């Protein structure tokens, strides 16, 4: 499923980053499942959304939901990532801040334990 998405990513730098991101998430959080919804790979816990990804021409968008974006706004800024209320972007010339990425996933998993809806 993830490979089908990756095969559509035309930018080889972004494709490599996404492959590494997906592999790290699967290693660190093996209980998460993956689904493709709205043409975006998403990591799901017990039927609830944890984080989603998309690839543009020159950046990766990572969407962890608004609550998480607000909670980590300062961290995204310090990492040099462009952010909106719903997502942050990793440009092709930026490194993945692994600590931050894994922290937001762990945060969402903890915050959404027992949550019964897909979105917050």
Regions found by a protein language model. Give the residues of each.
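Charge-dense, helix-prone N-terminal extensions
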Residues: 1-120
């Amino acid at each position: 499923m993830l490979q089908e998405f990756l095969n559509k990513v035309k930018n080889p730098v972004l494709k490599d980053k996404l492959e590494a991101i997906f592999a790290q998430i699967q290693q660190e959080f093996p209980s998460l499942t993956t689904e493709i919804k709205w043409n975006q790979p998403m990591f799901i816990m017990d039927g609830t959304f944890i984080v989603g990804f998309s690839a543009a021409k020159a950046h990766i968008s990572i969407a962890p939901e608004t609550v998480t974006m607000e909670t980590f706004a300062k961290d995204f800024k310090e990492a040099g990532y462009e952010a909106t209320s719903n997502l942050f972007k990793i440009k092709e010339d930026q490194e993945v801040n692994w600590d931050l990425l894994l922290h937001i996933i762990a945060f969402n998993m903890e915050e959404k334990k027992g949550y019964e809806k897909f979105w917050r």
